[in-house]
Amino acid sequence: MPSWLPKLFKNYTWKINTTEPIIYLTFDDGPDPKPTRFVLDTLEQYKAKATFFCVGENIRKHRELAQEIIDQGHILANHTMNHLKGWQTSHNDYVKNTNKCQETLEEYSASSLFRPPYGRITKRQTKSLKEAGYEIIMWDLISYDYDDKIDINQALKQLIRNSKPGSIVVFHDSTKAWKQLKIMLPKYMQALNNQGYSFESIPSRR
């Protein structure tokens, strides 16, 4: 992430302000049975907590998984109902879709955290969602696990090297990311654990 980006877009949370050795793992696009259960099992090994930015339609398909996420002490958060691209969606449709996902989430546990799919959201959409009480969460590190052409070892090396206290890291618990995720996540968590880091869910101000 370019260092100037958070300064330009101050309405978003890019990392958590802390000097403690804590990493904030986030998982986008689930729940999806195989990758999500793998993630939950891996988190359990490290007594780690995480934040799951879920697509509402996937929650409705896999309600038992959404409940498992909550039962294991993690956070369910909003990633729109249908994984919309903010730049290509009308203002009203985007806000309605986000609110529809929120209604689904509130059947389990209310969180004010929201991440726009692809990180794409307009100023007007941002203004409306923040006025409605959403906290817009971006990231300072991304795994690129969704890209099946990446050099996994090189991507891991960069991810580990650039991790800092308070980093918000993006993985994906999706079928598309599965081949890369199942290799990268355990190795990343082991490396950071060896450096003395713990893993927590993103705190909400609500």
Tell me the role of every PLM-derived stretch.
Residues 1-26, 31-47, 61-64, 186-206:
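N-terminal pre-catalytic segment of deacetylase/amide-hydrolase enzymes
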Residues 23-27, 50-52, 76-79, 112-114, ...:
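Hydrophobic faces of well-ordered beta-strands that scaffold small-molecule active sites
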Residues 30-34, 53-62, 84-92, 115-122, ...:
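Acidic-and-aromatic substrate-binding clefts and catalytic sites of carbohydrate-active enzymes
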Residues 40-49, 75, 84, 91-123, ...:
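CE4/NodB-like, metal-dependent polysaccharide N-deacetylase domain
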Residues 45-72:
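A short, conserved beta-to-alpha structural element at the edge of catalytic cores
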Residues 67, 91-98, 150-157, 182-186:
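Charged helix-capping and loop-helix junction motifs
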Residues 120, 126-161, 196-206:
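His/Asp/Glu-enriched short active-site or ligand-binding loop at hydrolase and phosphoryl-transfer sites
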Residues 163-176, 180-203:
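Catalytic grooves of carbohydrate-active enzymes
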